[in-house]
A protein has these predicted regions:
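Short, structured beta-strand/loop micro-motifs enriched in basic residues and often containing a Trp
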Residues: 35-45, 87-95
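Intrinsically disordered, low-complexity linker/loop segments enriched in Gly/Pro
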Residues: 115-179
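Short, Lys/Arg- and Gly-enriched loop/turn segments at beta-strand edges
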Residues: 67-79, 116-127
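A generic structural signal for residues embedded in beta-strands
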Residues: 62, 108-111
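Hydrophobic h-region of N-terminal signal peptides that target proteins for export
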Residues: 10-19
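Sec-dependent signal peptide recognition
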Residues: 2-10
Length: 179
């Protein structure tokens, strides 16, 4: 199941460096889609500019999008979608990147996930593409209502799937010598 997440993490370099700032750095969540959002990327590459900066130990709020960027962010979801305009042109949007002050290539960063807030809706689709299209007869789309405990859908009455929200990708950008 694909989910919209609002992720709050705390990042620090694994050295004795401390932040005096308590202000939360907010990354992503602007623009109609990832292409219009300066806090959204869809690949990991050293030429991507570091738009956001944070001190070691400072909290960062990532306003993330679903895997194909059709539902918007948690804050923009207002009503359950009846259909989805699925376009695989700009898949896998990620919030970021964030420069951690004092970090240099090769440093190990410690990330503590403080909270994951699921969006109101998620979806599952299959058939006609994806990972195992030859094992699925026909196409389907199921929209799920999400909360912290479970997901449920009118398409599969009586079924509740336990919510196991996760952040997706947490990574550092590669250096030019790592391409």
């Amino acid at each position: 199941m694909f989910k919209i997440l609002k992720l709050v993490i705390c990042v620090s370099i694994v050295t004795p460096v401390f932040s005096a700032e308590n202000e939360i750095v907010i990354v992503g969540g602007t623009g109609e889609n990832c292409i219009e959002d300066p806090g959204c990327i869809n690949r990991l590459h050293p030429d991507i500019p570091m738009i956001h900066r944070a001190n070691p130990g400072q909290s960062i709020l990532f306003r993330t999008r679903d895997t194909i960027d059709v539902l918007g962010t948690v804050e923009t979801q207002t009503s359950e979608p009846e259909t989805l305009d699925i376009n695989f042109g700009a898949v896998h949007p990620m919030a970021g990147p964030v420069y951690i002050k004092g970090a240099i290539p090769g440093d190990v960063l410690k990330v503590t996930i403080l909270n994951i807030d699921p969006g109101k809706y998620g979806f599952t689709f299959g058939g006609g593409g994806g990972f195992i299209p030859d094992l699925i007869d026909g196409e389907f789309l199921t929209v799920w209502r999400l909360n912290r405990e479970f997901a449920e859908s009118d398409d599969i009455a009586g079924v509740r799937i336990p919510n196991a929200s996760f952040p997706g990708v947490i990574s550092t950008l590669p250096g030019p010598d790592q391409l």
